[in-house]
Amino acid sequence: NSFVTRTNTCGELRSAHVGQKVTLYGWVQYQRQGLFLVLRDFQGLTQVIIPQDEAHSHVKELLCTAPLESVVRVTGTVSPRPPGQQNPKMPTGDIEVKAETAEILNSCKKLPFEIKDFIKKSEALRMQFRYLDLRSSRLQSNLRLRSGLVMRMREYLCNLHGFVDVETPTLFKRTPGGAKEFLVPSREAGKFYSLPQSPQQFKQLLMVGGLDRYFQVARCYRDEGSRPDRQPEFTQIDIEMSFVDQAGIQRLIEGLLQHSWPEERGSIMTPFPSMTYEEALAEYGTDKPDTRFGMKIVDISDVLRGSNIHFVQNALSYPHGSIRAICIPQGMRYLTNKDLESLKESAKSQFNQEMMEIICRPDGSWKSLLTKFLGEKEKSELTQVLNMQEDDVVLLAAGEHKQVCSALGALRLLSANLLEAAGLALRDPTAFHFLWVVDFPLFLPKAENPTELESAHHPFTAPHPSDASLLYSDPTKVRSQHYDLVLNGNEVGGGSIRIHSAEQQRFVLEKVLKEDSEVLSHLIEALELGAPPHGGIALGLDRLISLIVDAPSIRDVIAFPKSFRGRDLMGNAPDYVTPEELEPYHIQVSWPLEEKEAKKN
């Protein structure tokens, strides 16, 4: 209560304060029949007794007529609540404040919605009146937890490990492959700044500058259009170090998270387990596995290799063909026929992948189209390798390895959702399973032209030391020194050891990616002037906090988020500007026809 005229907050009064005269400020949350009201501030609630005697009639009138959510000041004496009227659900439930004087500091007009966590509001309405939504205890708690976590991260990095907090520019230039960058016009005709997707180049240049250890709570920008649960501006904990290897960065992040982790969420165990990209794809069908539950993908190619099933033999005749399956525990008991059909339909529509099912009946017999093609030996081997129990359901896919694994990985998650919706506890919502995923490919074929390559992450990632020679002979086979941090099936961080050789960086840009290296001449020149080996990582702060507090959306951990279409519904941004305002930037708007007509009308 330093620097302010209140004596206490609304959440701190206890029995020990009985008899004290206090001054409270807050919002009127509730008022009952002219007898008492509940005053709320950032810390909690206090029950205020409205005086009934003639001497305080003006106080009674003022407090009885104050609309809900009005801001008031109340001075009074702390008293114990009468026997039987204590409220164990409130931290201040043993006391009440008997009002002696009061003042309405600001009256509130009719609210667009009630400020109570249990009352459902449309998200659009919450976003439009975000300053009201922020009064809810849930958002208050989320933002304060976020603030505390960032403070402990600063303490760990700067005070304990010598990192330097540096602000990097947000006005820069477009980078190769930076198609998702926001452009900012300049007064030089035809020239634009770009808002960086991350401080990547600047943090590398800080290492060239000898800063050794850099850290920033960085604002980043990405123009991705309409994407649910993505924000056009977001925050990352950005880190770079000189003279470090992959293991060093990983140990740093494990220590950072352990130090800053909120006490009320339990402790996290380190070191985090690690898995290669290939292992993650083969066992979970994704590079961000949720390891809180089993149902791993199992390779059954060898079991069925000798069978005369046409689609099996057809799949295995291809170089990367495989037969894989997942076993859904108690699937027969918890999933309906409609559920199974929806799973197969998802595989078909999303991955163009057919699925076969095997249902293990309670008597041990199978219900499947495959039964007539399989001998007892193959059935026994499948039962063993898939660990099939009665009432389990197996989903089986045959085809190209990556496609089969990706489809089964998606069905694994969909099945888990269906099982939990039907009442089977599968994933512990209070558990936090961290995982490092390593050894990603350095390059991937472009979706629009598979004969050309693009960076799997970004063009500054160094090749794996074991694969360095392959960079010049067969870049498609090169693994990278990139590492992702995954939490409960969500990517919460990503980083890499960087290329610190100008020659190698130029080769990657020009020969492998077919990009104009001149655009990055400032970085390549810096690498020629004594760049140390270096690497780093960025943690997605919004995503991390949303997982810690189990928020349904990252919008619930950001003070003023954009809608999923990238709009600010409160301030109505983005907005139109006049031709006169555009003139200094040498820009004219070319209106789509329908908008032209709308503006005319």
What are these regions (language model features)?
Residues 1-601:
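Class II aminoacyl-tRNA synthetase catalytic cores and aaRS-like
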